A protein has these predicted regions:
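Intrinsically disordered, low-complexity regulatory regions enriched in serine/threonine/proline
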Residues: 1-21, 33-191
Length: 191
Protein backbone atom coordinates (compact mmCIF):
# COMPACT_ATOMS: atom_id res chain seq x y z
CA UNK A 1 0.00 0.00 0.00
CA UNK A 2 2.74 2.48 0.98
CA UNK A 3 5.97 2.86 -0.95
CA UNK A 4 9.08 1.86 1.00
CA UNK A 5 12.73 1.20 0.33
CA UNK A 6 15.47 -0.43 2.39
CA UNK A 7 17.52 1.59 4.85
CA UNK A 8 20.65 0.71 2.87
CA UNK A 9 19.09 2.37 -0.20
CA UNK A 10 18.26 5.48 1.84
CA UNK A 11 21.89 5.54 3.02
CA UNK A 12 23.09 5.33 -0.59
CA UNK A 13 20.72 8.13 -1.67
CA UNK A 14 22.01 10.46 1.07
CA UNK A 15 25.63 9.59 0.30
CA UNK A 16 25.09 10.31 -3.40
CA UNK A 17 23.46 13.64 -2.55
CA UNK A 18 26.48 14.63 -0.48
CA UNK A 19 28.97 13.56 -3.15
CA UNK A 20 27.14 15.27 -6.04
CA UNK A 21 25.54 18.29 -4.37
CA UNK A 22 28.01 19.22 -1.62
CA UNK A 23 31.57 18.14 -2.44
CA UNK A 24 31.89 20.07 -5.75
CA UNK A 25 30.78 23.34 -4.11
CA UNK A 26 33.01 22.77 -1.09
CA UNK A 27 35.96 22.23 -3.45
CA UNK A 28 35.05 25.45 -5.27
CA UNK A 29 35.22 27.19 -1.89
CA UNK A 30 38.73 25.86 -1.21
CA UNK A 31 38.00 22.75 0.87
CA UNK A 32 40.08 19.64 0.21
CA UNK A 33 40.15 16.14 1.61
CA UNK A 34 41.77 16.25 5.03
CA UNK A 35 45.53 15.65 4.69
CA UNK A 36 45.92 14.05 8.14
CA UNK A 37 47.04 10.43 8.49
CA UNK A 38 43.87 9.25 10.21
CA UNK A 39 41.41 11.14 7.99
CA UNK A 40 38.33 9.50 6.52
CA UNK A 41 36.84 10.14 3.13
CA UNK A 42 34.20 7.59 2.22
CA UNK A 43 32.73 4.43 3.62
CA UNK A 44 33.85 3.74 7.17
CA UNK A 45 31.83 0.53 7.54
CA UNK A 46 28.56 -0.89 6.16
CA UNK A 47 26.50 1.56 8.21
CA UNK A 48 28.51 4.78 8.08
CA UNK A 49 30.16 7.19 5.66
CA UNK A 50 32.54 9.82 7.04
CA UNK A 51 33.96 12.67 4.96
CA UNK A 52 36.61 14.94 6.48
CA UNK A 53 37.45 18.08 4.54
CA UNK A 54 39.36 21.18 5.53
CA UNK A 55 40.82 24.40 4.24
CA UNK A 56 43.49 26.77 5.43
CA UNK A 57 42.49 30.45 5.62
CA UNK A 58 45.48 32.51 6.82
CA UNK A 59 46.44 30.61 9.99
CA UNK A 60 42.93 29.19 10.54
CA UNK A 61 42.25 25.53 9.85
CA UNK A 62 38.54 25.09 9.05
CA UNK A 63 37.25 21.52 9.41
CA UNK A 64 34.06 20.15 7.87
CA UNK A 65 33.26 16.63 9.00
CA UNK A 66 30.26 14.85 7.50
CA UNK A 67 28.56 11.78 8.97
CA UNK A 68 25.99 9.80 6.99
CA UNK A 69 24.68 6.93 9.07
CA UNK A 70 22.32 4.04 8.39
CA UNK A 71 20.71 4.69 11.80
CA UNK A 72 19.08 8.01 10.94
CA UNK A 73 18.03 9.99 7.87
CA UNK A 74 20.38 12.96 8.34
CA UNK A 75 23.45 14.21 6.56
CA UNK A 76 25.30 15.65 9.56
CA UNK A 77 27.79 18.30 8.47
CA UNK A 78 29.85 19.70 11.35
CA UNK A 79 32.13 22.75 11.38
CA UNK A 80 35.04 23.49 13.68
CA UNK A 81 37.82 26.07 13.34
CA UNK A 82 41.29 26.26 14.87
CA UNK A 83 44.08 28.79 14.73
CA UNK A 84 47.35 27.01 13.99
CA UNK A 85 50.61 28.14 15.51
CA UNK A 86 52.84 28.36 13.53
CA UNK A 87 51.06 28.99 10.26
CA UNK A 88 51.78 26.33 7.62
CA UNK A 89 52.66 27.61 4.15
CA UNK A 90 49.92 25.44 2.67
CA UNK A 91 47.62 22.63 3.69
CA UNK A 92 49.88 19.93 2.22
CA UNK A 93 52.36 20.64 5.05
CA UNK A 94 49.86 18.84 7.35
CA UNK A 95 50.23 15.53 5.48
CA UNK A 96 51.48 12.56 7.48
CA UNK A 97 50.52 14.20 10.78
CA UNK A 98 48.11 12.54 13.20
CA UNK A 99 45.09 14.87 13.55
CA UNK A 100 42.98 12.87 16.02
CA UNK A 101 43.35 15.50 18.78
CA UNK A 102 41.29 17.95 16.71
CA UNK A 103 38.31 15.63 17.31
CA UNK A 104 38.79 15.11 21.06
CA UNK A 105 37.76 17.40 23.95
CA UNK A 106 38.40 20.23 24.56
CA UNK A 107 38.86 20.81 20.81
CA UNK A 108 35.60 19.09 19.87
CA UNK A 109 33.48 21.23 22.22
CA UNK A 110 33.15 24.02 19.64
CA UNK A 111 32.05 21.75 16.81
CA UNK A 112 28.67 22.86 15.40
CA UNK A 113 26.21 21.19 13.04
CA UNK A 114 25.43 23.44 10.11
CA UNK A 115 21.74 22.58 9.91
CA UNK A 116 20.53 22.71 13.51
CA UNK A 117 23.21 24.41 15.63
CA UNK A 118 24.19 28.08 15.78
CA UNK A 119 20.58 29.25 16.01
CA UNK A 120 19.90 32.77 17.21
CA UNK A 121 16.68 31.68 18.90
CA UNK A 122 15.49 28.64 20.79
CA UNK A 123 14.90 25.65 18.48
CA UNK A 124 11.16 25.63 19.18
CA UNK A 125 10.81 28.95 17.32
CA UNK A 126 13.37 28.27 14.59
CA UNK A 127 12.12 27.64 11.06
CA UNK A 128 15.56 26.32 10.08
CA UNK A 129 15.60 23.80 12.94
CA UNK A 130 12.23 22.30 11.98
CA UNK A 131 12.09 22.62 8.20
CA UNK A 132 15.59 23.16 6.78
CA UNK A 133 17.62 20.43 8.43
CA UNK A 134 19.61 18.03 6.27
CA UNK A 135 17.20 15.14 6.70
CA UNK A 136 15.63 12.96 4.05
CA UNK A 137 12.02 13.48 5.09
CA UNK A 138 9.53 10.64 5.38
CA UNK A 139 7.51 9.62 2.33
CA UNK A 140 4.65 7.27 1.46
CA UNK A 141 4.86 7.27 -2.33
CA UNK A 142 7.60 7.23 -4.95
CA UNK A 143 6.62 10.81 -5.82
CA UNK A 144 7.03 11.72 -2.13
CA UNK A 145 10.51 10.16 -2.11
CA UNK A 146 11.49 12.16 -5.19
CA UNK A 147 10.19 15.37 -3.58
CA UNK A 148 12.17 14.64 -0.37
CA UNK A 149 15.32 13.98 -2.42
CA UNK A 150 14.83 17.18 -4.42
CA UNK A 151 14.39 19.27 -1.26
CA UNK A 152 17.46 17.76 0.44
CA UNK A 153 19.57 18.34 -2.69
CA UNK A 154 18.42 21.95 -2.81
CA UNK A 155 19.24 22.62 0.87
CA UNK A 156 22.66 20.97 0.70
CA UNK A 157 23.61 22.70 -2.54
CA UNK A 158 22.41 26.13 -1.36
CA UNK A 159 24.27 25.92 1.94
CA UNK A 160 27.52 24.50 0.53
CA UNK A 161 27.64 27.30 -2.04
CA UNK A 162 27.39 29.71 0.90
CA UNK A 163 29.69 27.89 3.33
CA UNK A 164 31.49 31.13 4.17
CA UNK A 165 28.34 32.45 5.84
CA UNK A 166 28.42 29.46 8.20
CA UNK A 167 32.07 30.15 8.99
CA UNK A 168 31.13 33.73 9.89
CA UNK A 169 28.20 32.51 11.98
CA UNK A 170 30.53 30.08 13.82
CA UNK A 171 32.79 33.05 14.64
CA UNK A 172 29.82 34.90 16.17
CA UNK A 173 29.44 32.05 18.67
CA UNK A 174 33.06 31.01 19.29
CA UNK A 175 36.69 32.10 19.46
CA UNK A 176 39.23 29.79 17.90
CA UNK A 177 41.46 27.66 20.08
CA UNK A 178 45.14 28.09 19.25
CA UNK A 179 46.75 24.71 18.58
CA UNK A 180 49.87 23.24 17.07
CA UNK A 181 49.67 21.26 13.84
CA UNK A 182 48.70 18.06 15.70
CA UNK A 183 45.81 19.63 17.64
CA UNK A 184 47.62 20.08 20.96
CA UNK A 185 46.13 23.10 22.74
CA UNK A 186 48.43 26.10 23.07
CA UNK A 187 45.72 28.53 24.14
CA UNK A 188 42.14 27.60 25.06
CA UNK A 189 39.73 30.41 24.20
CA UNK A 190 36.19 30.46 25.57
CA UNK A 191 33.37 30.53 24.64
Amino acid sequence: MFYSIKNSEILKIRNDIFLHNAVPYLKQNGFVESPFLDANFGKNNRQLYIYEMCRLENSNLEFLTTYISLRDRYIQIRLNIFELFTKPKNISKLENINGIKFYLPPNSQKEERLDIDMLKTIPLFSYRFWFENYKLKSFHTKFGLNMAIRKLKYLIERDMKNINSFVEKWRQFHKTNITDWEGNIIELNNP
